[in-house]
């Protein structure tokens, strides 16, 4: 190989590495955008004001809560309640507890989904920590609220007849350390 082709190969490989690093930083925001646009993976609806606050269904549904943390993020993240039983149209407030176990301030972000996936379109979030980056100072512990309801149309959808339990699952990922 000539020096020119070696140099060309080196620049190509360097460009590939830089592209991969940039894509890894963009992966979580791009995934969130993809899920919001397509509804993929049990992505929920989001509202600022509940239109169903006075309209309640009759069919009880159990909502279970799940929490996961990426291995690169030294946080403890757990739901304060393992499950709640609600009816469609009932506004519900739950909390997740998050603690930074490191000696550094860290910014993290979460993604979420609802299973079974077919029920995600009926899960309406009113307020959630998942739409913003979260800064936790070293050793800090915080409660993160989620307000939601199940759309009343859930009861009328024949595909939802077999659904008795929904799971709201969050996964936190590290965005970056904060320089002191």
Curated annotation (Swiss-Prot):
InterPro entries: CtaG/Cox11_dom_sf (IPR023471), Cyt_c_oxidase_assmbl_CtaG (IPR007533). The chain crosses the membrane at residues 9-29. It is found in: Cell inner membrane. The keyword 4Fe-4S does not apply. Its main location: membrane. Keywords: Cell inner membrane, Cell membrane, Copper, Membrane, Signal-anchor, Transmembrane, Transmembrane helix. One of its GO terms (biological process) is respiratory chain complex IV assembly. Residues 1-8 are cytoplasmic. One of its GO terms (cellular component) is plasma membrane. Pfam families: CtaG_Cox11 (PF04442). Gene3D superfamilies: Ctag/Cox11. Residues 30-180 are periplasmic. It is a single-pass type II membrane protein. One of its GO terms (molecular function) is copper ion binding. Exerts its effect at some terminal stage of cytochrome c oxidase synthesis, probably by being involved in the insertion of the copper B into subunit I. Belongs to the COX11/CtaG family. This is Cytochrome c oxidase assembly protein CtaG. The lineage of its organism: Bacteria, Pseudomonadati, Pseudomonadota, Alphaproteobacteria, Rickettsiales. The gene is ctaG.
